[in-house]
């Protein structure tokens, strides 16, 4: 089976003084989360589309699903965890408890605040994850990346044409992801920045799918302005 895991667990601290977590803020008069969910509903391959949100926001999430006529029976809402990877594991726990997990099950995980992903990106994630077990969505780095260990001095400058910027979706064979996560030490889990690092640490290959420049993550007030401009300018592909 194929599952979508929409990660809506953040509280949006970088968005500044706003009344709601960033995933519930509007772009073009509709919550960011709803824009994102609508992209996944269009993909018939998904057996379930699972939204993980902070426990205290589950009721609000269910309310906006009703308000915007999200009636697809595949859409479920569960409580997220304390961090990104714990949230993904909560989604997997839901799958295990309700459906069981088969050897070939795939999960497509995606940031709720990336509303401009395309059908191509989603479908390529499904295909590559089913074939190879793990895939990340990336774009080539445009700017030179510098590394600083002390935030004051440059310690290295990687070769730019070997650098990519990670986006989402990040998609996995569920058993591979679960087993790899369980094998990590507590110290390793504390420094994880995304789910693909779980697979990299296990020694398993992670394939790449081409993202899009406009597949932005809406995390700051500036991003919110850019997101509205993308919609109003009809820049993103469907």
UniProtKB/Swiss-Prot annotation:
Pathway note: Cell wall biogenesis; poly(ribitol phosphate) teichoic acid biosynthesis
Pfam assignment, any one: IspD
Keyword Cytoplasm appears in the UniProt entry: no
Enzyme type, top EC level: transferase
PROSITE patterns reported in the protein's UniProt record: ISPD (PS01295)
GO molecular function annotations of the record: 2-C-methyl-D-erythritol 4-phosphate cytidylyltransferase activity; D-ribitol-5-phosphate cytidylyltransferase activity
GO biological process: cell wall organization; isoprenoid biosynthetic process; poly(ribitol phosphate) teichoic acid biosynthetic process
CDD domains per record: CDP-ME_synthetase
Marked site: Transition state stabilizer: 14, 22
Domain of life: Bacteria
Record SUPFAM superfamilies: Nucleotide-diphospho-sugar transferases
Family matches, as InterPro entries: IspD/TarI, IspD/TarI_cytidylyltransf_bact, ISPD_synthase_CS, Nucleotide-diphossugar_trans, TarI
Binding site residues for CTP: 7-10, 81-87
Function: Catalyzes the transfer of the cytidylyl group of CTP to D-ribitol 5-phosphate.
Protein name: Ribitol-5-phosphate cytidylyltransferase 2
């Amino acid at each position: 089976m194929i599952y979508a895991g929409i990660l809506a667990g953040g509280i949006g601290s970088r968005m500044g003084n706003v009344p709601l977590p960033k995933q519930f803020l509007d772009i073009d008069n509709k919550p960011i989360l709803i824009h994102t969910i609508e992209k996944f509903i269009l993909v018939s391959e998904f057996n379930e589309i699972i939204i993980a949100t902070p426990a205290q926001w589950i009721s609000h999430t269910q309310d906006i699903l009703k308000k915007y006529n999200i009636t697809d029976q595949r859409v479920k809402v569960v409580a997220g965890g304390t961090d990104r990877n714990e949230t993904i594991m909560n989604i997997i726990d839901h799958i295990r408890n309700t459906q069981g997990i088969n050897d070939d099950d795939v999960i497509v995980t995606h940031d709720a605040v990336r509303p401009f992903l395309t059908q191509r990106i989603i479908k390529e994630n499904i295909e590559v994850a089913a074939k190879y077990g793990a895939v990340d969505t990336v774009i080539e780095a445009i700017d030179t990346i510098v590394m600083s260990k002390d935030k004051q001095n440059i310690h290295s400058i990687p070769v730019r044409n070997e650098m990519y910027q990670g986006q989402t979706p990040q998609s996995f064979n569920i058993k591979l992801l679960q087993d790899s996560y369980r094998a990590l030490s507590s110290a390793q889990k504390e420094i994880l920045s995304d789910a693909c690092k779980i697979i990299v640490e296990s020694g398993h290959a992670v394939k790449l799918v081409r993202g899009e420049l406009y597949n932005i993550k809406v995390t700051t007030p500036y991003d919110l302005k850019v997101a509205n401009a993308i919609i109003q300018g009809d820049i993103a592909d469907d």
